[in-house]
Amino acid sequence: MAGKRQATSNLNHENWDLEEEPEERGTFRTATEEELKTRVIKKARRKIAGGSSAAEEDGAEEKTAEPKSVFSGFSGFGKPAASPAAGSPFSFLANVTAPATTSSSEPKKSAFSFGFSSSSSSADRPVSTSICGTASTSSTAPSPLPAKESTSTVDGAKPTTSIFGNISAAKKESSEAKTSSSSTSLTSTMETSEYRESVADLNRSVIKFLQDQMGKSPYCILTPVFKNYDEHLKDLQDEESARTNSTKSKTAQARSQEPVAKVSRASSPPKAATTFTFGKPSAPIGASVSPLAKKPNCTITSGGTTTTTATPLVSFGSTASFTAPVPSSSSIFSLTAKPTGEAKSDDTPKSSIFSFGAKDTTTKKDEPNFSAPKTNGFSFGLKSNNDDKPSTSLFAGFGKAPGGAGDGAKGFSFTNSATPFSLGNIHPPAAAAAPAEEEKEEDTPPKVEFKQVVEDDAIYSKRCKVFIKKDKDFGDRGVGTLYLKPVKDSEKIQLLVRADTNLGNILVNLILSKGIPCQRMGKNNVLMVCVPTPEDSKATSLLLRVKTGDEADDLLEKIKEHIK
């Protein structure tokens, strides 16, 4: 803050009450031209990419150059290098070659006239070429609506077709000649496209007309233009609705003439059973099936053997109506229901690697002599009937009872057993009980220990809480022990209350004499009106609170007994 104005005088404790000299305020004045010439005036300038240097800019201060665009350094908004000269947005219509007419010097007129009349006669103007392809014959009177197609022409002039070929008599005749359903839909699509292109041509004509009129006079009133636009658009919509109605009637006639195809149910093949059925009973063999419901059999490959099955391998709650052949090998996850037919020892499927909740019902007789003991990789809470065989699994099971003689082959057992790696029911050693009790003792907060100051010559003592009235409410002074002790060289009794602290501060210190009011108050309180300590100047209400009402009665009796 180098430019901050400094204090003109020093203000301290010696001259703070002295009057300051009034400060003369100056006035702003305009500097002369000579002073301005000597000053250096700097202006902030924007750095432009590819611009001139700072020296050139300083020299060009007096020149009023055109301001450059902020985005002049950005080439994205620039025009392409080989772009042609900018022209009218509808310049593509200038290259359209109009058909030959009887006179080469005849001017052309748009088919859509927006309320602007011409002074030329009907004999001087032939049929013109329309952008939207509607042939018209010009007349002297202004026409608010576009001229319809006319059969009569002037001077033998033929009506010209549209440059877009939208309204063509040949197309209309060909579309009316078709009667099939496919040709009818194609014709309706063409007619819809014709309607859209007609509306687009109408919009282009309006925009071109508006641009021409705005170029001549920007103050012209355009209300007649939009009125004529509404009329032209309504005519196009009426024509389109007429085409749509005729197309619908032709389609209805074509459909009424089509023969109705009949499908015989008896000739259809029976429906094949699906591979996966969820809660749906299988249909009995030989039942009639819809011809559209035919589905191929599902082929299931397991290893190198391909087996085509007609019954579902995975069935949830469904019951098969006939005995299905048992596959050679079962699935890794066995979720199939047990077939109703009797299973032989040779056809018994192998046990699943992961079996969730399935009970092993195989007996010792059905097992071959050369086969290894069948065990599950992971068995969750299962009980096997083969208790006499050891478990060869790396993980012997979670919550499964041990096998008996083969306990040594177990890797980890999460059961209540005596193995070294037992995580089932871990019993802590007995020696750890003592440290646990010590930790509990350490968690308890330490009690405040203090040495109570005891009055040896006291004839009565009682622990109480002292309240002294200040203004309108009682204030807590503290908890202590009340003592009644005789005064030396006197028959009077001293009432002393010491706080339960190491210092034993005196809370109440007075002599019991006649005239001190004392009474019971509340449930367990004794009220006295006295001077609590010699330091107090005036008497106030003193409230002594004990634990029970009996103790309060006993305390009141002792105090009244020793008042003399």
Curated annotation (Swiss-Prot):
Residues 77-92, 110-123, 177-192 have a biased composition (Low complexity). GO terms for cellular component: chromatin; nuclear membrane; nuclear pore; nucleoplasm; polytene chromosome band. Its main location: nucleus. Residues 1-197, 237-279, 339-383, 425-447 are annotated as: Disordered. It is found in: Nucleus, Nucleoplasm; Nucleus envelope; Chromosome; Nucleus, Nuclear pore complex. Residues 24-38 have a biased composition (Basic and acidic residues). Residues 77-475 are annotated as: 9 X 2 AA repeats of F-G. Keywords: Activator, Chromosome, Membrane, mRNA transport, Nuclear pore complex, Nucleus, Protein transport, Repeat, Transcription, Transcription regulation, Translocation, Transport. Pfam families: NUP50 (PF08911), Ran_BP1 (PF00638). InterPro entries: NPC_Nucleoporin, NUP2/50/61, PH-like_dom_sf, Ran_bind_dom. Residues 39-48 have a biased composition (Basic residues). Contains FG repeats. FG repeats are interaction sites for karyopherins (importins, exportins) and form probably an affinity gradient, guiding the transport proteins unidirectionally with their cargo through the NPC. FG repeat regions are highly flexible and lack ordered secondary structure. The overall conservation of FG repeats regarding exact sequence, spacing, and repeat unit length is limited. PANTHER family: NUCLEAR PORE COMPLEX PROTEIN SIMILAR TO S. CEREVISIAE NUP2 (EUROFUNG) (PTHR38697:SF1). This is Nuclear pore complex protein Nup50.
